[in-house]
Amino acid sequence: MLKKKNRITSSVAFKEIFAKGNVKESECFRIIFKKNNLDYPRYGIVVKAQNSKSAVQRNALKRRIRNILRDSLPVFSKGFDIVITTKKDSINMDFSELKESLNELLLKLL
């Protein structure tokens, strides 16, 4: 689990990032990011019901993404608000492929 300070929780913050953020994409992720005035990054994860009808699969994917983010958190000392949305292909990928794809995309932000 990410620390509370590293999570985006309010719908207002999500809407602002979606409206004013920049976008980077890969085959299985879409990252929308916006600079914040904090000394640490904040993350939000969105897995649409269109990707999988099963809530169990969607929540498992969110847990995997949080685990990857927890490992890469020390790399991002800059202040960014980052929303990670998944694409349909990401549901069936194994952990190592997810980690490689997400880390590759996050490194583009540096």
Task: Show the residue positions of the predicted features.
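Positively charged, solvent-exposed patches that mediate nucleic-acid binding
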Residues: M1-L110
